[in-house]
Amino acid sequence: MRELKIGERIPVEAGGEAVVSRELGRGGQGIVYLVRYNGREYALKWYFISRIKNPEAFRNNLRRNIEDGAPEGGKQFIWPLFLTEQKKNGAFGYLMRLAPSGYDSFTDIYNGYKWEKPLAKGRPAIKRKVKFASLDVMIAAALNIVKAFRALHLAGKSYQDLNDGGFFIDTRTGDVLVCDCDNVAPDGDNFGIGGMPGFMAPEVVRGIAKPGVLTDRYSLAVVLFKLFFRGDPLEGSKVLQCVVMTEENDLIHYGRDPVFVYDPNDASNRPVKGVHDNVIKLWQIYPDYIRQAFTLSFTYGIQEPNARIIEKNWIQMLMQLKMDIIHCSCGRTAFLSSFEKTGEHSLVCQNCGSPIYTMSVRDFEMPLYPGAKLYRCVTEKGNDDFETVTGAVIENRLKKGLFGVKNMSRQTWQALYPDHSLREVGP
């Protein structure tokens, strides 16, 4: 493939020409350029045409995705917008919006740092820490990742190449942008893409299945595990015995004989102290239901694709996790399960001795501390809206130190009080 030149004009199917400004980056499928089209700046992905298995089918799928538009209005997706004309040698590309500033790649978040260009020419690159502003923000990011893939799957499409390079995340808010959407295809269709080792479902690694919704769900579990535990769910002592991860070793450890690092029935691939310290430390911190979800995903879920956790169930668990966070007045932030239980609805902070009370809300146990919030998916049965706030713990304006739950929804709640009386709580 001939690389594009600065100032080169690329005809676009929708009319007009995109003018190349500079290169932004390159990967296995092609090169991404900054271009100007119709008075606006876009990113142009220009393909290495020889690396596409069936260019005509791939191009037609891109055109169909452009016509369909991104799921749910496209706010979470860097979606293909315009297709270029094909050159005589068959080369082509597509235009997409630029990722806004303030977002970091999943890879940088996973590594905990990124390298930035120096302010002055000739100076060394600057290493910057990359981490979430809070535990709440990290869980918000996890919810937004799941939400994006739920929207994609509900639209009848699968991502097919889910990996750590597929996301940009605002570490201040948890907002997520899904990129590399050019391989998205209707569930059941595939145009040659397989995925990245470590993220691909074992049946894809073995070559006995094509990527689809069920394999997406395996990859989604990998992404969430990496986000929470900063490690690979299948990389432990067994994998470390391989000096070099060759294609054959990838096939063995991620395809034919994958073993979860915390498989309850197989201890052959446990995390190694000094190498997998993040996984060892963080695995103990998360509540049992989260550990059980990942254990299911990487044991039974490896062998049985239909047993993999669906997006709706991930959202329910992540909402429980979000509500399990306790911000104690002493500054300690931890999950509810980390606090000492002193009664049916009472806990104590081991750090400062402060009492913390909880309240049952449907299937959730909600810690009651100033600023704690309820969400629509919690207060309304059958609803999975995890963004709309429907209630909050507030302090009584007349009696300092007295707290209550304010109904911020449009519905009247039925509340069971400590004296066992059932009362209505209006908005």
Show which residues each predicted segment covers:
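Conserved catalytic-loop aspartate of Hanks-type protein kinases
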Residues: D216
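Catalytic-loop of the protein kinase fold
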Residues: A140-A142, F149-T171
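Conserved C-lobe activation region of Hanks-type protein kinase-like domains
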Residues: L224-R291
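Forkhead-associated
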Residues: K400-P427
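Conserved activation segment of eukaryotic-like protein kinases, specifically the C-terminal portion
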Residues: N190-G207
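Conserved beta3-strand ATP-binding lysine motif
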Residues: K45-S50
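Conserved structural core of kinase catalytic domains
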Residues: I78-V137
